[in-house]
Structure formats: C-alpha cells, structure tokens
Amino acid sequence: MRLWIALVALLVVGCVDSSTAAVRHETTIPSIVTSPTVTIPATTAAAMPMPPPTVAAQTLQDDQPPSIGAEPLQKMHVQRAFPNLSFKRMVDMAYPDDGSNRLFVLLQPGVIVAFANDRNVEAAEVFLDIRERVSDRGNEEGLLGLAFDPDFRANSYFYVYYSAANPRLSVLSRFTAHTAGSVANADSERVILEIEQPYSNHNGGQIAFGPDGYLYVGLGDGGSRGDPKGNGQNLSTLLGSILRIAVGTLDESGSYSIPADNPFVGSEGARGEIWAYGIRNPWRFSFDRESGELWMPDVGQNRFEEVNIVRRGLNYGWNVMEGSECFEPSRGCDTQGLEMPITEYGREGGCSVTGGYVYRGKRLPSLYGAYVYGDFCSGKIWALRHDGTKITEHLEIVDSKLEISSFGEDQNGEIFVLSFDGGIYRLVVGGR
C-alpha cells in the first residue's frame, strides 16, 4: 500500500544462499488484554463511526458447497463482524488449522492479538508483542505478515515478516507458541531470512503456505518512485518477487532450503528462491483453497492497480509495464515475455489495491468461486470469476467508506474485511 495524505498506508538442491542472524532483542509478553477494545500506543489513524453491529448468516440446506456461477454476483454491504472488538492499524488476519476456530490479527506496530471467531466475543488476548524489534518509522514498514505452520497443531510454529531498522531490513522469522493453544514465546525467534531494503516503502510482507507445503513470500521492489534500482526486472535480487522456500527442515542456524523445481534454480546470476518476478508491491496474495491458484494484486505507481494469477517463472512486467500499458517510456516498450494482469483499474476505482480471497464459504452462495478484492483509498470491493482463460463475471459489490487494509479468512472459508481504522467487517447480502 502507499502513504495517502497523512495516513499510514500500507502498502535448493545444492548451496543455499540465505541470510541468518541472531535475535536482536528480547521482550516479554504483556498481560492478557481483557478489555473489549485492544488499543496499541502511538496510533496515528483516527477511528471513524461504525454502522450498527447487525450480522446474520445465510446458510445452505446441506453440507455441500455451492456450484460456481449457480447464482450471479450481486451487490452487498458490510457490517461489523465483532462489534465488541476494535483494533488500530490492522494490516492482516490469519488462522491456524488447529480446530480452535481462533482468529489472529496483526497490528502494524508489532503486536498480534487473538480472539475466538464468535460474533459475541468480548475480549482479545495479546498473542505476540515484538514492538521492540519492529520498525514502523516508514509508513509502509512494520509487522506485515503472519503464517501458521501447516503442522501448527503438533509443532506450534508460526512465521512472521516484519521491518527492522539500523540497518533497514525485512525480516522473516519463525516463532513458537508455548503450546499450540497458548500465547507465543517471544524469546523463541529464529531468523530465517533478512533482506536489505533501500527505501522505506514497497515492503510487500505477505507470507503464506501453498498447497505444496512451501512458504511463499511477497517482496516489493524496494521502494521509491518508478523502481530506480531496477529491482523488478533483476533476478539477482530477491526484491520485486514472490519467493518460494522450504522451511520444514530448518537447521540450527535457521537456514531454509530451495525447492529443486523452482524456476531459476541453476540459472546463472539468478536467485533460486524466486518463483515469479516483475512485481512492484504485492499487497496481500492468497491461494484458492480449492484450485490452489495463487492470486496476487500489485499496487501501481500513478495509473493502474492490477490483479494477477501467479504462475511459475512468469515476469509480471514491472517496471517495464504498469498494468497492461508501458510505464516509462509510456509507449513502445518491449512486452515480449511479460505476463499481463487479468484485470486492472485506474484512479476512478481508487489508488491502492488490496488483495483478498477466492470465496469458498457457505454463507454467500452468489459469491462462491469468485475472487474478492478491494481498494484502500476508495473503500470499493469487487468480485470476479475467471475460467482460467478470461473473466466471466466482474462486479463492484460494495462501495464503502472503509480503509481496506486487508481481507481475512476463517477456517470455513468465510471472508472478513479489515479496515485500518479499527473495525472488522463481513460481507452481507440485503438485510440479512
């Protein structure tokens, strides 16, 4: 994401070339928060009035998922999902596959809070507090990504991506919860990867395990205007790329391994971790839990916000292209070998795309199989269906006043909308 006015925006087989480091600081977990509202100090965003907390679920008559396209996309609105909870500077949501039905929310200054996925929940607890290690001095820096190990129930591992200072770095680390159902041990950090950042913006930050069990990491181009260092088209740097690494067998130093089928393994001068490249700032990618497809938005420079389906080894064009048009120069660029977005929009739709999920829940049959995404600046939310070749349906489903910093998903595939100002919302059809 990007700074907009004064608001924080977000937005191998063989030798392994990875960076490791010791834990920089130690910190203790504060007391569990018992008040209905969890507020982290030094908040810069002001809360906005929230609509009445009314939510009702639309359910199916049986346990079978809806059929894709059985109902056309339709207009919706948003309502508070957890009216007793409010958080400042929310940037992501995740859940562990441990049967606990808990949700975990990332707060940009460096805190993760956890709570029951229950509309009537009254309190959240602090799961991890690493504010002493996290730098959020740059408007797009901070604690930006969380992924639970696929075997979290057994090993209690989870992974975070955050910004550090002096020097300016993006850090990927593994932590351990005391037990899978408890708070995290802040002293358990094992740094996996540190990436030097030339500027304070375009940090990416999304991390997620794919259906193949590997960890995918989203990195922006390193920042500033127009990718001045050319990182997007440079395979010798990890910046401007989606990485794919194996973290299941970390050695004592924290070193990961690179899957042998990564596209640039063995290519001279290329980093083997790279899965796809030519990316400006991928703010919130996700895997379709049914098809396994990787959906990724890319925040644009001045003209276009775009959505892509990421595939092995492809070049998504930045900084030759912005969206489907030449960047600088604005015409005559060589587009050979570049992958075009499946959709894009200009400034009439907003200014900073936020990626969501392919909906696989049961509450909203008309949305089943559609990719849901939004815009931080305009508060608009769209849904689209894609048949593997082309878009078959595309609709603006919500026009809100929210600052959409992220989307979330629970264990049942239901989608939440996170507004940076403090509210968590769900999508609702009509008055239901």
Predicted features along the sequence, with ranges:
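C-terminal motif of bacterial Sec signal peptides marking the signal peptidase cleavage site
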Residues: 12-14
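Acidic, Gly/Ser/Thr-rich repeat motifs that build Ca2+-stabilized beta-propeller blades
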Residues: 48-226, 284-287, 292-300, 349-387, ...
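Extracellular mucin-like PTS domains
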Residues: 23-54
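Conserved blade-ending motifs and adjacent loop-strand segments that build the rim/top face
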Residues: 279, 390-411
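Bacterial signal peptide processing site
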Residues: 16-18
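Surface-exposed loop and turn segments in beta-propeller and other repeat-based domains
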Residues: 82, 125-139, 187-204, 238, ...
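Short, conserved, GDST-rich strand-edge loop motifs in beta-rich repeat architectures
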Residues: 218-238, 305-306
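Beta-propeller blade signature
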Residues: 172-180, 231-247, 310-311
